[in-house]
Amino acid sequence: GTVTVSHKEISKLEKGEPGTRSYSANLVHSVDALILREVVAMAMHQKEVVARVTKLIENKSYQLFSNNKGKDIAMVEKLQSLYKQSGFLSDRILDYLHEGTISLLDKDTIEELKDMLDVINQMGEPFEVMTIHDCFRVLPKHVNAIRKAYIYQLYKIAKTKGKMLNFLLSQLFNMEVNFGFGKLNPEDVLSSDYALC
């Protein structure tokens, strides 16, 4: 027999018009999703990866080896480039760092990476996180660790001093955007007692 599949249009997807508020919602949701991904990655980190990258930095093993993996090089270069443009280093970079790629990182990226590894190590053992949108579920013993990871992501955004917002808005509007930054001290964010509810 023949199987016929048909569909019925229930509602039409409405796209936002340039200059409307829908751009704002998309930007906010994108930043929320970024924070969520980074927090989950920090909580569910792979101990071996964190140990390997920490050792590479401590040993200053920055020479290139002939066994480089092209895709790893390309991804490290891309993530470092995005860091330079936005001021925000994603911990996705950890998965691509090894003896053959660590030398691609400049001094600023290495320093940012050290801070990230320090926070991950302070969080302790990896643990499972369940998420729904921007809601995190963890065992009670991990609540402070997840809160610390969340605050750290907000600190990283604040530390960009508006560079990340300008980067995102420039992509959204396909033109150079350069807003000023207020008087927020990123250290105040880091030392905040922000509570996730």
Where are these regions (language model features)?
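Conserved catalytic core of nucleotide polymerization and phosphodiester-bond processing enzymes
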Residues: 1-197
